[in-house]
Amino acid sequence: DWQSYVLAAASVALATREAVSNHLRQQAPAAALVRLSELAPLFQVARNAKYPLYVLDASNRDVLLIANVLPPGAEDQNPIRRVLFDAPPTLAHTTLLRFEDFVEVIAWEWDEPIVRGREVELRVVLRALRPMPSGSKITVRLQQGRLSRVNPLAHDLVEGVYPPQHWRQGDYLLHRFRVQVPTLEVVPGPHEVVIGLRRTESANYKLTIPEGDTGEHDVRVYPGQREFAVVGEVQVW
């Protein structure tokens, strides 16, 4: 069967990332066992060199079986394909924010209804302008006044599956994040959807679009350092 075939192809010891890339770059079918943390940089090399890279087995938490062919009957289990697209995924709300010369936020949505005590998923579409520094994170929170907030903390971009230092101009990324809505700390009623991007633990990216206090699609920049913007409103029940 194909599993036995690719496991045999993966039996050669490859000590470095470059060795793995060269192994997969050949015309003959080739496979390799790699750590999950190596998938994104290897995928980036494959994209730049224009050779295929597939994940044949992602059942292990730490190790993946990758190959340069997709055998008959096999499915590509590459998690990067869940978050990286050539065209923008369609979400409920269109918007436009640009953070410096790195990335744009072009769409967003939350699962509704948003009910206190329940878990919901938020989604954001990003358009990459260039690679971002590693460790960059996103904030997508709901806010009513000073006290009622849902999901106030920054979290990893695109589930940490494809870190932003590997992005390239023209990439579209679908960011998903599941949120537990607090039962007691949040009041019912309309909440603003606020988006920002964090560069480091102590610094945020600055908004360059819109250039003023307001922009397309009813965007409103928070006063002050131009680090956060309101892109819309949702109801919390």
Name every feature range the model reports, one short phrase each.
Residues 5-237:
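C-terminal luminal/periplasmic domains and tails of membrane-associated envelope-modifying transferases
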